[in-house]
């Protein structure tokens, strides 16, 4: 498999509450082995913490790791300006249906959602939707109106609930390639 490295020096991964979140520690480990010089910051929703240990991510990632809650003392103050350290890109990996709908509505009721709403940096959404309908598709199209938003390329995956094959955007190599393309094209929210 030909996988391209992220062409920046720092990125932020926002982990949301899908069962796919259980695989994120492995992907963070893979990313750090594949590109050890890359600084990886991570935010984790409280729902995602049901599927992974934030403490493990603090050992695997080499940037800031925090829980997406106003009560977490580790939330960096720069989230108020759409930043996370010097991150040049944001990945929502995995992106649950609830998270994507909240982003499309402009909600900013958690530190990470506020950061993602305010950022001008490329934002790649690696969705793990259980299904779709007109409302979901309309909200996806609303997000695609933002010049700095793109969805990760879809790949075949297996649903946890029934083991059937389904197309999902939970694709870190594809998300990194999309981020590189967006950066080359100068796609930001400005």
Swiss-Prot record:
GO terms for molecular function: carboxy-lyase activity; oxidoreductase activity. GO terms for biological process: peptide antibiotic biosynthetic process. Keywords: Decarboxylase, Lyase, Oxidoreductase. It is an enzyme of class 1 (oxidoreductase). It catalyses: [cypemycin](1-18)-L-Cys-L-Leu-L-Val-L-Cys + A = C(3,19),S(21)-[cypemycin](1-18)-L-Ala-L-Leu-N-thioethenyl-L-valinamide + hydrogen sulfide + AH2 + CO2. It holds the Pfam family Flavoprotein. Its EC number is 1.3.99.36. Belongs to the HFCD (homooligomeric flavin containing Cys decarboxylase) superfamily. This is Cypemycin cysteine dehydrogenase (decarboxylating).
């Amino acid at each position: 498999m030909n996988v391209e490295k992220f062409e920046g020096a720092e990125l932020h991964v926002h982990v949301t509450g899908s069962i796919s979140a259980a695989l994120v520690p492995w992907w963070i480990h893979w990313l750090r082995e594949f590109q050890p010089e890359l600084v990886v910051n991570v935010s984790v929703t409280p729902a995602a913490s049901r599927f992974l240990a934030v403490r493990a991510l603090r050992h695997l990632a080499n940037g800031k790791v925090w829980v997406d809650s106003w009560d977490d003392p580790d939330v960096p103050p720069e989230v108020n300006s759409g930043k996370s350290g010097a991150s040049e890109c944001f990945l929502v990996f995995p992106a649950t249906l609830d998270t994507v709908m909240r982003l499309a509505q402009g909600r900013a009721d958690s530190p990470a959602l506020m950061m993602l709403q305010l950022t001008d940096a490329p934002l790649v959404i690696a969705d793990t939707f259980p299904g779709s309908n007109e409302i979901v598709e309309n909200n996806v199209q609303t997000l695609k109106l933002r010049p700095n938003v793109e969805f990760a390329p879809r790949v075949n995956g297996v649903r946890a609930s029934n083991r059937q094959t389904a197309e999902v955007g939970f694709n870190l190599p594809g998300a990194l390639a999309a981020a590189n393309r967006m950066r080359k094209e100068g796609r930001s929210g400005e």
